[in-house]
């Protein structure tokens, strides 16, 4: 099966020529494919951030070959893989980056290790698998290569998975963690609206314990539900519970980073 689209997500940034090299490799092998970028601004080596962004983006893409490269283990024994899921193919390092995206597409169906030399560049470098392994594999798949031709099948249960973020729900209490922080400083938590509802914390005000401090926060549906500079707890566009400051930076205000613990309770003080 051929694909009209190839999508790229990396931590390469735009200062250097890394992204252009990947685009060029794909264009030379699969000139009919349209190559688009998800983002290249993932924080350097932050596999979990990349996994979150990819998982929350892929449901909105057409069937495609989707390349994700945030690869601190490049040049080591970690595998490169291609995974079919929901009519698309995910290509990248087997370091957990692709797993949540596969889940978001309905689950991984088949996976192969990218070992066949015919589907990579000649004499690949040890430190640029994005250009030398993943981009050519993606291009060949977009051009109609059979998945199993790229290398041996890997049982999907053997693929590397990231640890599941903490979400613990009880009556009037939700213990979770920061999943990611966007460029506006909005703090996305690992808990969903459904989990917030189970805790009974979907209306009025709640108390947030984060960054060693506690705050009373209004529960709203958008930023303007609080005055400028005010904190609001809401459900974001990905369906996750999130914290924002109207017109400001919630991460800076609360002193939070990815992975930090956050507890949400009723407005009465925590004991």
Name what the model sees in each region.
Residues 5, 29-32, 49, 60-70, ...:
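Active-site histidine-anchored catalytic micro-motif
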Residues 17, 21, 30, 45, ...:
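Conserved active-site and cofactor/substrate-binding residues in soluble primary-metabolism enzymes
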Residues 86-98, 106-120, 181, 200-217, ...:
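Conserved subregion of the PPM/PP2C metallophosphatase catalytic domain
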Residues 260-267:
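Surface-exposed interaction regions enriched in Ser/Thr/Asp/Glu
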């Amino acid at each position: 099966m051929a694909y009209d689209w190839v999508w790229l997500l990396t931590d390469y940034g735009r200062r250097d020529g890394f992204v252009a090299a990947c685009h060029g490799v794909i264009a030379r092998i699969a000139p009919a494919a349209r190559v688009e970028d998800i983002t290249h601004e993932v924080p350097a080596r932050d596999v979990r951030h990349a996994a979150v962004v990819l998982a929350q983006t892929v449901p909105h893409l057409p069937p495609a070959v989707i390349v994700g490269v945030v690869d601190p283990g490049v040049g080591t024994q970690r595998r490169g893989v291609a995974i079919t899921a929901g009519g698309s193919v995910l290509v990248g390092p087997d370091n957990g980056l692709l797993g949540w995206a596969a889940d978001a597409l309905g689950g991984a169906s088949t996976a192969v290790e990218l070992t066949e030399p015919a589907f990579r560049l000649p004499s690949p470098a040890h430190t640029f698998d994005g250009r030398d392994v993943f981009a050519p594999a993606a291009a060949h798949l977009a051009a109609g290569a059979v998945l199993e031709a790229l290398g041996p099948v890997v049982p999907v249960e053997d693929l590397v998975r990231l640890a599941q973020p903490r979400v613990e729900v009880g009556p009037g209490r939700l213990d979770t963690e920061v999943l990611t922080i966007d460029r506006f400083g909005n703090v996305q938590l690992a808990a969903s609206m459904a989990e917030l509802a189970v805790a009974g914390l979907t209306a009025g005000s709640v108390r947030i314990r984060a960054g060693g401090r506690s705050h009373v926060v209004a529960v709203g549906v958008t930023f303007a539900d609080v005055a400028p500079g005010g904190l609001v707890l809401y459900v974001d566009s990905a369906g996750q519970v999130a914290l924002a400051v109207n017109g400001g930076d919630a991460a800076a205000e609360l002193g939070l980073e990815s992975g930090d613990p956050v507890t949400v309770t009723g407005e009465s003080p925590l004991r």
